[in-house]
Amino acid sequence: MCGIVGLYLKNKKYNKDLGKFLTGMMNNMSTRGPDSAGFAIYSTERKKKYKYSICYNENNIKEIKKNLSKEIKDAKIKIISDHFVLETSLKPVKVISIIKSYDNLNLVGYGSSIEIFKQVGNPRDVVNNFSLKNFSGTHAIGHTRMATESAITTDGSHPYSTGEDECLVHNGSLSNHNNLRRTLKKKGIEI
């Protein structure tokens, strides 16, 4: 049992309230998935800029930030709870390679408009930890999870990044996950 919410705003005057709207929706779904939660926020596309949503598993974020800023000269880093968003004009192939060189960093999504955040814990706590109510954007998707067949981890939390400016949430187990995994790997998608 999980909860899925989504919101697409057709009127730009509400973009500043997207996080507030999604917070209420996530809170209402808390009982359907009390183990962990996550959300993806889409904002207006920033031409020639990419945003990388990264979860870090170490307390020394200042050192990580300093090192990344040396490797990615135009990096702007915004820390939010145990995640940060790195913005740069460098192409994804280069930045993803740099991020993967750090054992304590986990890339959870990237693109010119998407930011993804997820954590273990009650969804009410998760949305508060990330101050979701303060986010603005054009559309969003959220997920509350009740782990039934796998461990309760941030990696197991949704949304899952499926590519540049793409994400996926699902409700229930995928009985053909091994076939899907093999098919995706054959197409060059890293899992």
Feature names for model-found ranges:
Residues 1-191:
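Conserved short alpha-helical segments that host acidic/polar catalytic motifs at enzyme active sites
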